[in-house]
Amino acid sequence: MKIRTTSYRISTLSKKDKRLTIDIDITLPNGNIIKTSAIIQLHPLAYFLGKIPNASFSLLYLSAIVYAIDRSVERKRYSVDGWSREFEVEIHIPEYEALLQYRDLINKLLSFLTGDFWDCNFVGTASIPPIVYEQSAYFDGITGVSLFSGGLDSLIGAIDYMTNNPDGKIFLASHYDSNMTGPKSDQEKIELQFRKKFAGRYLHLPAILIEPSISKETSCRSRSLMFIAIAQIVASYAKCNITIPENGSVSLNFPLSPSRRASCSTRTTHPIFLKQLQVLINVLGLYPNLVNPYEKMTK
């Protein structure tokens, strides 16, 4: 199916809640058009505008667009083989030249991650209205960034980092989709305990909201790209690595049952996906290395 982004617009809900909406038109096989959008809460990410390469934000916008498409198109209804969907996407995005140069890598990466057939093309867009964020030392002193989903592996990753780096300060990167409230609740419960034991050793803001305006598909295979896109913004500013804490068994997701064959298994932290994404981060001139310290471990 043919898909194109149509506009970028900013809305202000409060002084500290400005949201970027990227509108998307999805043309279904029958010719009907679904209008969806990717909604990104800009606080606190707007603080880093002008402080890191622009390509860092383009990667965030790309991940949000992919997530919105992934969540808006039902697999069962629109797959070509019972699982995989075909997406021909025209993406209007800042810094499009760099993404266009590496579109083959991006299409390969997305197709492996979600189990779909992605054919993305990148074109320029009108400039996004600037967002002013007050200067702050809040993000200074960060020595590491770790994905923090609220699951057991991300909990262990945070604890290990703070235990092994007593003089360090870790940023726990989280994502929030209001259509899926479970992870945010888990994150909040864990942080209550962190405040007692690791006060001053970590930084965790309320999970950054990125969600589609339509929520029909729940497999969410593209979610990890968005997690990492959020993390790389902070890591690019702090000039540190990104820890992706996931035990090796889950990363590889062995096909131990028929339901886990091929792309039915999640590939969110699969070594192939992380290697492809690392190459993309490098060619875009961004800083962080992606590190999974538990790649050769299991629970």
Locations of the language-model features?
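Alpha-helix C-terminal capping segments
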Residues: 149, 159-165, 230-239
